[in-house]
Amino acid sequence: MKRPGDGRQESPSSTARPDNRNTGSRGEEIATSFLGQQGYRILERNFRCKGGELDIVARAPGERSLVFVEVKTRRDRSYGPPQLAVTPFKQRQISKAALTWLSRNHLHDSQARFDVIAILLEDGGRHSIEHIVNAFELAY
């Protein structure tokens, strides 16, 4: 997209970033509410460290294991379903962040799993949600 007056091109992705952040934040709110309704106890949201980020850290109902939840949200399916964005590279980043979280919280020996919540935002404020339990294993 051309900027007026300077002849430079601006990439479409840079103009969409604030909207993408809003979409992601909305998805994380939906996912947090969904997990709460399912009986999950939310321990932390948006944990950031040098290696990556964790969207949600929770404890599953009736379980001692921790659940690291990656939330992927899209407004349409033009790039495929949201969960396809959890690439092997992203899985490694999430795994590193999870190991850091466990270390900082002195929970080295805890059992944990990695879930993905895929959200598709629809017209009229509706959404569809898919919770993929054990979506991937710890990746190095």
From Swiss-Prot:
CDD domains (alphabetical): PoNe_Nuclease
SUPFAM superfamilies for the chain: Restriction endonuclease-like
Bias-annotated ranges (Polar residues): 10-25
GO molecular function: nucleic acid binding
Annotated region (Disordered), positions in chain: 1-27
InterPro entries: Restrct_endonuc-II-like (IPR011335), tRNA_endonuc-like_dom_sf (IPR011856), UPF0102_YraN-like (IPR003509)
Family: Belongs to the UPF0102 family.
Name of the protein in its database record: UPF0102 protein Ppro_1186
Species assigned in the record: Pelobacter propionicus (strain DSM 2379 / NBRC 103807 / OttBd1)
